[in-house]
Design a protein with these regions (language model features):
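Cytoplasmic-side transmembrane-helix entry/capping segments in multi-pass membrane proteins
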Residues: 4-7, 21-28, 156-165, 222, ...
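Structural signature of hydrophobic alpha-helical transmembrane segments
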Residues: 1, 68-73, 129-140, 188-202, ...
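Juxtamembrane and boundary regions of transmembrane helices in multi-pass small-molecule transporters
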Residues: 14-29, 33-98, 246-304
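Short helix-coil transition sites and intra-membrane helix breaks within transmembrane domains
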Residues: 1-3, 34-43, 128-132, 175-182, ...
Length: 304
């Protein structure tokens, strides 16, 4: 998304139109595409890591793909015919459009693209023999080794705050499960739902609880806190943990409705000057679209 933003902005300026709506379309397009594979967005990979910590076999690279395709299709239709009409063009032009651009280094660009494609193919072909994080590190070493990026640039590119957050929340998620706190919260939710709740009802409640938390807490923390609870609920009602885990993964990635739901949302706010209420207008209906896809496809691809 960051790589595409200058191109989209330049196209809008050349066409004589404001770039804000186009940049918001780029944000939503990136979010829709992130649902298609396990590495499409960071929260998907985080969910897999938490599942491993909880002793559950993680999802495969394309396990999320049927749901992602459904969200892409319905989301694109919604945004094309309804969503983009709900908000105005702010007329703001981001700062990067006003600065001089460096000429493209074709060698570095070619190496970067080829390395990315190779890493993705290795992950997709043999996720058991080549874990995702190992393939990613090898790809990063190739980029640095071929001088596409210096060591200093690579270090600066790491979001250390995010690394610390994920590391600490991984411990909290495991502690939630091992200490029994996840089971206690799961029991409380089941008491609220009443005796013998249907898997559909449980899925619905978990989806909206995780999705709402995501809008204010960001997607990765939401998934890491909810997965132990969701898996405990699945165990207590005697169903497979996979439909519940997939529901939480998709709900956590549905970071549409507030600027705080994902880092790329905050980045887009800086580029467009859209407000909190603008994200709510366009994002809340998209949450319902995502729920429809989840509720429809979970019983088909991940039966309870």
């Amino acid at each position: 998304m960051t790589a595409m933003a200058p191109l989209v902005t330049a196209m809008c300026i050349a066409a004589g139109v404001g770039p804000s709506k186009a940049l918001l379309s780029l944000l939503f397009g990136a979010q829709f595409g992130g649902f298609v594979t396990l590495v499409g967005v960071g929260s998907n990979a985080t969910a897999n890591s938490v599942m491993s910590e909880l002793g559950i076999t993680p999802f495969g690279f394309f396990s999320i793909t049927p749901f992602g395709i459904g969200i892409c299709i319905l989301g694109t239709l919604y945004f094309t015919f309804i969503g983009r009409k709900l908000i105005p063009d702010t007329g703001y032009v981001p700062e990067f459009a006003k600065t001089d651009k460096k000429p493209l280094d074709k060698r570095k660009a070619a190496i970067s693209v080829i390395t990315l494609l190779c890493v993705l193919m290795v992950i997709a072909a043999s996720p058991k023999n080549m874990p995702m994080h190992v393939a990613a590190v090898i790809g990063a070493l190739i980029i640095v080794g071929t001088k596409c990026m210096t060591v200093q640039e690579a270090i600066r590119a790491i979001d250390w705050n995010c690394m610390l957050l994920v590391g600490s929340l991984t411990a909290i998620s495991t502690g939630f499960k091992n200490s029994g706190a996840g089971d206690a919260v799961a029991e409380l939710i089941l008491k609220i739902l009443g005796e013998d709740p249907s898997p559909f009802m449980v899925t619905t409640v978990i989806f909206f609880a995780a999705a709402i938390l995501t809008q204010f807490m960001s997607n990765i923390p939401s998934i890491m806190l909810f997965l132990p609870i969701g898996i405990s609920i699945a165990e207590q009602i005697g169903v497979s943990p996979y439909p519940v885990a997939m529901t939480i993964t998709l709900a956590g990635a549905a970071s549409y409705a507030t600027p705080f739901a994902a880092p790329q949302n905050m980045m887009t706010v800086g580029w467009t000057h859209y407000k909190f209420v603008d994200f709510c207008k366009i994002g809340l209906p998209m949450l319902l679209v995502t729920y429809v896809v989840v509720a429809t496809l979970i019983p088909i691809f991940l039966p309870y």
